[in-house]
């Protein structure tokens, strides 16, 4: 059996734990844009400098190795080939699966008001990269609106 989970948020990680508890032998691959696992609920703690990037993680450092999980990090899914049971990544790589779980969660919504979406200083807060961009921008900002 080949399992593929898209997303390494709380739902994806919990699914991986559950699969590994029931099936210790099968192939398990996780795919995400993220380069490290982090709690989205704790991103505000990063912005307030109460936690660093490592302290946002909710899994042990060796989680993927210990659970024999292949993690394709910093990867975006381009297309699902359902009939062929393959996930195509942006770089053209295809990952085969028998069972697929899409656990990507939501995305921030920036309303289509004027040029708001194109502004370099307007952010959503869903990913660590969002928090990092906000933190960097805040260093130079004179006024901040939340």
What are the residue ranges of the model-derived segments?
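Beta1-alpha1 glycine-rich phosphate/pyrophosphate-binding loop at the start
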Residues: 1-70
């Amino acid at each position: 059996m080949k399992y593929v989970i898209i997303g390494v948020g709380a739902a994806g990680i919990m699914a991986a734990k559950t699969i590994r508890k029931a099936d210790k032998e099968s192939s398990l691959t996780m795919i995400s844009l993220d380069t490290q696992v982090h709690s989205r609920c704790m991103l505000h703690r990063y912005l307030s400098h109460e936690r660093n990037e490592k302290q946002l993680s909710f899994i042990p450092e060796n989680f993927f190795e210990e659970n024999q999980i292949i993690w394709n990090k910093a990867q975006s899914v381009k297309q699902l080939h359902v009939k062929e049971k393959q996930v195509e990544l942006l770089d053209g790589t295809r990952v085969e699966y028998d069972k697929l779980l899409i656990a990507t969660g939501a995305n921030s919504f920036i309303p289509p008001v004027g040029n708001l979406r194109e502004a370099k200083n307007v952010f959503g807060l869903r990913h660590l990269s969002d928090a990092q961009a906000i933190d960097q921008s805040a260093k130079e900002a004179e006024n901040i609106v939340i």
